[in-house]
């Protein structure tokens, strides 16, 4: 049994520094086709992919993201929940379909579809020798992103992905993930607090040692400290409002 795919995904890490080499149209097409082969709930295909090589558009999106690799990459993808085409079908339907695609369930379906497509693209790109980094930072200003990309109603930007050849001095590495026994629950969820705390304490030590080694002692924070800092920062609190402005979560 080949373990090629297993070994490939186990090596995954975010690449944030790329060579100045644009992806060819053929490569972009293959990546998108690989993405389209992902599973999709009820065959709704409630997503679209926006490919961006226009430097001005990239720069505008960089201002939203704050990350240089939004511009400095081989190619930029933006993944959106897309019910615009379903809305067009709805205009000639005998039933009110908006009750479904404008619901919270509709949001979940579209977001999951987009994520599955993106992961297919990520794995395919890495198999081709490219590096990738996901860009949730495009949600820093959803209204601006919708304006930049001319997104119609019922279309919502979920995240981006920068793709390209890793720079020669790119030295990223896979971060240790949560322990297998902490994320895999056999038959039912195991919520025993003592076990959970013990597993997280071990993981905190692993992450602290990882950062200490990677940064020559400049970073030593634990995973729990990172989570406290991130989740304690009340960011993007307008998301429900922005979703509703897009025509989603109406009920």
Regions found by a protein language model. Name each.
Residues 1-251:
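Acidic, surface-exposed loops and disordered segments
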């Amino acid at each position: 049994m080949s373990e090629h795919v297993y070994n490939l995904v186990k090596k995954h890490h975010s690449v944030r520094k790329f060579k100045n080499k644009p992806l060819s149209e053929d490569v972009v097409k293959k990546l998108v086709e690989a993405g389209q082969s992902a599973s999709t709930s009820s065959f709704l295909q409630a997503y679209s992919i926006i490919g961006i090589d226009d430097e001005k558009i990239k720069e505008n999106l960089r201002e939203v993201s704050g990350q240089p690799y939004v511009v400095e990459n081989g190619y930029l993808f933006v993944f959106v929940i897309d019910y615009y085409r379903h809305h067009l079908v709805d205009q000639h339907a005998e039933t009110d379909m908006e009750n479904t695609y404008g619901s919270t369930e509709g949001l979940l379906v579209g977001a999951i579809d987009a994520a599955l497509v993106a992961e297919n693209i990520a794995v395919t790109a890495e198999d081709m020798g490219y590096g990738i980094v996901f860009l949730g930072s495009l949600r820093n200003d959803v209204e601006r992103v919708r304006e930049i990309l001319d997104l119609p109603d019922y279309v919502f930007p979920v995240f981006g992905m920068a793709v390209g050849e890793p720079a020669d001095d790119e030295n990223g590495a896979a971060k240790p993930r949560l322990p297998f026994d902490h994320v895999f629950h056999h038959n039912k969820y195991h919520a025993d607090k003592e076990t959970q705390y013990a597993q997280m304490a071990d993981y905190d030590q692993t992450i602290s040692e990882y950062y200490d080694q990677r940064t020559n002692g400049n970073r030593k924070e634990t995973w729990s400290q990172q989570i406290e800092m991130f989740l304690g920062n009340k960011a993007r609190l307008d998301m429900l409002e922005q979703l509703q402005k897009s025509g989603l979560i109406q009920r």
